[in-house]
Amino acid sequence: RRWCFRVCYKGFCYRKCR
């Protein structure tokens, strides 16, 4: 099953899917 979550690091936010 694929799921995505938001990752924020040092002012950068991006979507990470596994």
Curated annotation (Swiss-Prot):
The keyword Secreted applies. GO terms for cellular component: extracellular region. It is found in: Secreted. Keywords: Amidation, Antibiotic, Antimicrobial, Disulfide bond, Secreted. Disulfide bonds join 4-17, 8-13. GO terms for biological process: defense response to bacterium. Hemocytes. It comes from the Eukaryota. The modification Arginine amide is found at residue 18. Significantly inhibits the growth of Gram-negative and Gram-positive bacteria. Belongs to the tachyplesin/polyphemusin family. This is Polyphemusin-2. It comes from Limulus polyphemus. The lineage of its organism: Eukaryota, Metazoa, Ecdysozoa, Arthropoda, Chelicerata.
